[in-house]
UniProtKB/Swiss-Prot annotation:
MF term (GO), any: metal ion binding
Source organism (scientific name): Epichloe typhina
Protein name per Swiss-Prot or TrEMBL: Tubulin beta chain
PROSITE patterns documented for this protein: TUBULIN, TUBULIN_B_AUTOREG
Gene: TUBB
GO biological process, one term: microtubule-based process
Superkingdom to which the source organism belongs: Eukaryota
Annotated binding of GTP, by residue: 11, 69, 138, 142-144, 204, 226
Keyword line: Cytoplasm, Cytoskeleton, GTP-binding, Magnesium, Metal-binding, Microtubule, Nucleotide-binding
SUPFAM superfamilies recorded: Tubulin C-terminal domain-like, Tubulin nucleotide-binding domain-like
Length: 448
């Protein structure tokens, strides 16, 4: 079995993580104590991807929960699914990182990191064939961003050949929690570019928009936002957790989605989007799912793919779906919107099918796109970063923890490089490459 070890760091990561475990426990027929009382054999078949079987028919998530302050952990432990997790897997400090990336990455976080790695090692040893790691965190804070990226690079060192997927909540343009978000995010992206294999970008503002516009919620809570994120996370990992005709795992996903190793930042979407109560009022069809899935309003990152082009994308359908119908729809999308797909990667939509729909739905689809328009997101953070860094605002918080201004400059230029790489592939066409060769061809001049 191909197991995945899940890490959640910081407040945001722990809250999203908790929502994710709640969602997939439900899908696998586990109650809040991890005891199986499901109905279908299929729920058990690949349970071991995310769960360890303990004694007495109890299943325990392969999850490591990390934070630098006890608050969020206590909330998870007191929450509806608090009894699900193994008590030894809660690793927390007391001091907090105070939204300071340097504290999470260099001082406070570094003290805790060995303790976390011990737990990760123990989880990894309990696996038959570890496929990789997934980590949920935000990029705007101190613990999730600073310590999260520290853990990623440490795990990278120890398990260099395993996949590393991150679900990263990027700071959004209008909804901001702290003033130093641009610093934390830029320093984190600098790390993710090098150390992660696939990063699913999620953004609070886009989630708010989906809640307001599509789900008609007048004032969405973080619970509603986390519910959306967990729907996507559950969709991305469906193929790993249930048997299907066309399965993909983290590695296949990466092979199909990442044309150039640095460009692994994906936009995600989910269809059908229904608010938590309103599942049962309408039937959905494959064309409808496809249309909703490719709708920019459905993307969970605040960048509009119509401003860029898709390098690759992947569609994961769940439920009783006809293979042929899916393929026809995908071909249809590509033919009608060919300007939004780069022409130098033929058939760049990958599809996967899984027979088991999410709870309460007949069928659903998850969309993962590697679009060049994700650069908008980095550009936006980069502009805010430059505005503050030019004045050296708030820098003493970071230099006081032993960081150097050089690191900021490096992170900034690495992020700018990323943006221009995306831009370069957005502009690249097929003809340009041929023209270059023509220029280089020797001209047949008569010899003097």
């Amino acid at each position: 079995m191909r197991e995945i070890v899940h890490l959640q760091t910081g407040q945001c990561g722990n809250q999203i993580g908790a929502a994710f475990w709640q969602t997939i426990s439900g899908e696998h027929g586990l109650d809040s104590n991890g005891v199986y009382n499901g109905t279908s054999e299929l729920q058990l078949e690949r349970m071991s991807v995310y769960f360890n079987e303990a004694s007495g028919n109890k299943y325990v998530p392969r999850a490591v929960l990390v934070d630098l302050e006890p608050g969020t952990m206590d909330a998870v432990r007191a929450g509806p699914f608090g009894q699900l997790f193994r008590p030894d897997n809660f690793v927390f400090g007391q001091s907090g990182a105070g939204n300071n990336w340097a504290k999470g990455h260099y001082t406070e976080g570094a003290e805790l990191v060995d303790q976390v790695l011990d737990v990760v090692r123990r989880e990894a040893e309990g696996c038959d064939c570890l496929q990789g790691f997934q980590i949920t965190h935000s990029l705007g804070g101190g613990t999730g961003a600073g310590m999260g990226t520290l853990l990623i690079s440490k795990i990278r060192e120890e398990f260099p050949d395993r996949m590393m997927a991150t679900f990263s909540v990027v700071p959004s343009p209008k909804v901001s929690d702290t003033v130093v978000e641009p610093y934390n995010a830029t320093l984190s992206v600098h790390q993710l570019v090098e150390n992660s294999d696939e990063t699913f970008c999620i953004d609070n503002e886009a989630l708010y928009d989906i809640c307001m516009r599509t789900l008609k919620l007048s004032n969405p809570s973080y619970g509603d936002l986390n519910y959306l994120v967990s729907a996507v996370m559950s969709g991305v990992t469906t193929c790993l957790r249930f048997p299907g005709q066309l399965n993909s795992d983290l590695r296949k996903l990466a092979v199909n989605m990442v044309p150039f190793p640095r460009l692994h930042f994906f936009m995600v979407g989910f269809a059908p989007l229904t608010s938590r109560g309103a599942h049962s009022f309408r039937a959905v069809s494959v064309p409808e799912l496809t249309q909703q899935m490719f709708d920019p309003k459905n993307m969970m990152a605040a960048s509009d793919f119509r401003n860029g082009r898709y390098l690759t994308c992947s569609a994961i359908f769940r439920g009783k779906v006809a293979m042929k119908e899916v393929e026809d729809q995908m071909r249809n999308v590509q033919n009608k919107n060919s300007s939004y797909f780069v022409e130098w990667i033929p058939n760049n939509i990958q599809t996967a099918l899984c027979a088991i729909p999410p709870r309460g739905l007949k069928m659903s689809s998850t969309f993962i796109g590697n679009s060049t328009s994700i650069q908008e997101l980095f550009k936006r953070v980069g502009e805010q970063f430059t505005a503050m860094f030019r004045r050296k605002a708030f820098l003493h918080w970071y230099t006081g923890e032993g960081m150097d201004e050089m690191e900021f400059t490096e992170a900034e230029s690495n992020m700018n490089d990323l943006v221009s790489e995306y831009q370069q592939y957005q502009d690249a066409g097929i003809d340009e490459e041929e023209e270059e060769y023509e220029e280089e061809a020797p001209v047949d001049e008569p010899l003097e």
